[in-house]
C-alpha cells in the first residue's frame, strides 16, 4: 500500500511538473510572438493614432485592424450586428473560446501631437486620450499570439478578436 501511495505521489508530481513546464513554455512563446510582431503592432497603433476617428466613423481604423487580422490568418466577419465598423476576427475551432475586445475609437476635440505638452495635431480634431489606438492594437497582438499557439497545437480552442467601435459614446460592447 505504501508503495502504491508513493508511486501515485511520484506520478502526480511528475504530471504537475510537466504541466507547469508546458505552461511556462507557452507563456514564453506568447511573449516571443508579441516580440516577433512588435514592429507591425507599433505601425498599427501609430496608424490608428493618426486616423483618430470618433464613434461609428472608425472606417480607417477598423480597416487597419481587419487587414492585419487577415494577414495573420484570421477569418474576418465585417459589419457585425449591422454596425459598419464592428467586426470579429476568429481562428481555431471548438472550446474553449477565448474572446478579446479591441477598441479603436477616438474622442472628439482632444487632438494631440506626440509631445508631452498640449499641442493639437488638428485644432478641434479628435484624438486618442484614452489610448484606444494602443488598446485595439495590443488586443489584436494578444489574439495573434494565441492564434499561433493554437496553430502549433500547444493549446486547443478558438480565439475571437472583437473589433469594438464606439466604446466611448454609444453602445458597441453590448452587441
Which positions does each model-derived feature cover?
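Surface-exposed loop and adjacent secondary-structure segments within mature catalytic domains
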Residues: 169-175
Amino acid at each position: 500500500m505504501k508503495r502504491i501511495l508513493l508511486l501515485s505521489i511520484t506520478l502526480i508530481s511528475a504530471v504537475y511538473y510537466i504541466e507547469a513546464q508546458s505552461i511556462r513554455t507557452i507563456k514564453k512563446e506568447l511573449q516571443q510572438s508579441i516580440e516577433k510582431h512588435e514592429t507591425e503592432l507599433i505601425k498599427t497603433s501609430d496608424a490608428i493614432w493618426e486616423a483618430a476617428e470618433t464613434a461609428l466613423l472608425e472606417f480607417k481604423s477598423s480597416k487597419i485592424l481587419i487587414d492585419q487580422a487577415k494577414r495573420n490568418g484570421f477569418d474576418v466577419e465585417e459589419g457585425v450586428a449591422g454596425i459598419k465598423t464592428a467586426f470579429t476576427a476568429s481562428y481555431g475551432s471548438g472550446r474553449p473560446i477565448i474572446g478579446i475586445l479591441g477598441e479603436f475609437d477616438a474622442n472628439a476635440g482632444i487632438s494631440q501631437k506626440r509631445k508631452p505638452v498640449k499641442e493639437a495635431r488638428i485644432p478641434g480634431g479628435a484624438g486618442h486620450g484614452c489610448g484606444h489606438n494602443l488598446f485595439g492594437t495590443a488586443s489584436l497582438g494578444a489574439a495573434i499570439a494565441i492564434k499561433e499557439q493554437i496553430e502549433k497545437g500547444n493549446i486547443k480552442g478558438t480565439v475571437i478578436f472583437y473589433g469594438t467601435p464606439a466604446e466611448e459614446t454609444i453602445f458597441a460592447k453590448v452587441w
